[in-house]
């Protein structure tokens, strides 16, 4: 019987994993979704206590200090130190407790700022990351370094996945820390519901930055399905990119249009070019993933945004904001 511990299990991806596992009801696996209330993973003793209590054979490591572009830009040291602590505590404790496999979640932001496109798994360490979020990026890169070190010294199959921009139900909508899609959903909902005295055609929704940067997005449920596949079937320490196909890349302005459509918003969209764009593009190749799963069908962006907006409206009172 596998015992799977999910760190960061109450967040965006953890909730998606929980939903998929509930539907699958695997008879040979027990899953425990740990949140911050279960253990402070920056504390080694607390991490060890969690592992001793749950006795996992496998770990999906999602726990991290995370945030959007502007939160990262202002707090690089905190992102570096907290994530280094979390990752080292989880990986070392997993090893000490004899965990067979750990799948850690990285991010496409770890790739070099100056690079050729599309980026792939071989390019992680080819140069410094974008300066806007170097603290988070270097901490995440070191997971890959540690995975190789545990394999070299102990033969551990501790690996990592690199998703593109994740979104979906149970996201963090707090405007101070949110990523682009939940941030837009939060602000669009405010605009639509709180300014009822203003005719909708006169309302203006502001897109931060030029709207031109290109991004690939992955719906949290799709990522959950793929991470479960990695846990059960992918037997390499080398990272694997879990990203939608390159042809599904869209501009930030197109994302804003999709969010507006989901809210039936008929006002204007304007770009505030005084705000930073971050990296212009981060196009990732999913060729390795496609070599294993050539027929996997990603949820299209409009369908996924519609579902995310619907969840936010229906769960507004308990949504993280």
Curated annotation (Swiss-Prot):
Binding site for NADP(+): 8-14, 140, 163-166, 179
EC number: 1.1.1.271
Record keyword Metal-binding present: no
Entry annotated with the keyword Isomerase: yes
Pfam families linked to this entry: Epimerase
Oligomer status and interactors: Homodimer.
Similarity comment: family membership: Belongs to the NAD(P)-dependent epimerase/dehydratase family. Fucose synthase subfamily.
Protein name as catalogued: Probable GDP-L-fucose synthase
Natural source organism: Drosophila melanogaster (Fruit fly)
Name of the gene: Gmer
């Amino acid at each position: 019987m596998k015992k799977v511990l999910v760190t960061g299990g109450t967040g965006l991806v953890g909730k998606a994993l929980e939903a998929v596992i509930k539907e699958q009801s695997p008879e040979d696996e027990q899953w425990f979704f740990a949140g911050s209330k279960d253990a402070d993973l920056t504390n080694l003793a607390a991490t060890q206590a969690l592992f001793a209590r749950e006795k996992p054979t496998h770990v999906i490591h999602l726990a991290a200090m995370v945030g959007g572009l502007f939160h990262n830009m202002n707090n690089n040291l905190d992102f570096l130190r907290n994530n280094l602590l979390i990752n080292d505590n989880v990986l070392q404790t997993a090893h000490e407790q004899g965990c067979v496999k750990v799948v850690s979640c990285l991010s496409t932001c770890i790739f070099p700022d100056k690079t050729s496109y599309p980026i792939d798994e071989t390019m992680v360490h080819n140069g410094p990351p974008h300066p806007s979020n170097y603290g988070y990026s270097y901490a995440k890169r070191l997971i890959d370094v540690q995975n190789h070190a545990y394999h070299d010294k102990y033969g551990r199959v501790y690996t990592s996945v690199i998703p593109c921009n994740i979104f979906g139900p149970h996201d963090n909508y707090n405007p101070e820390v949110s990523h682009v899609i939940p941030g837009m959903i939060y602000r669009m909902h405010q605009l639509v519901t709180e300014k009822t005295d203003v005719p909708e055609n006169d309302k203006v929704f502001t897109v931060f930055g030029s709207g031109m940067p290109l991004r690939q997005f992955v719906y949290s449920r799709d990522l959950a399905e793929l991470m479960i596949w990695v846990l059960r079937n992918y037997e390499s320490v080398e990272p694997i990119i879990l990203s939608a196909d390159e042809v599904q890349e869209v501009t930030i302005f197109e994302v804003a249009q999709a969010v507006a459509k989901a809210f039936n918003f008929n006002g204007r969209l304007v770009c505030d070019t005084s705000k930073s764009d971050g990296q212009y593009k981060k196009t990732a190749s999913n060729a390795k993933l496609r070599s294993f799963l050539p027929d996997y069908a990603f949820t299209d962006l409009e369908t996924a945004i519609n579902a995310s907006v619907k969840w936010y409206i229906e769960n507004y009172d308990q949504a993280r904001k």
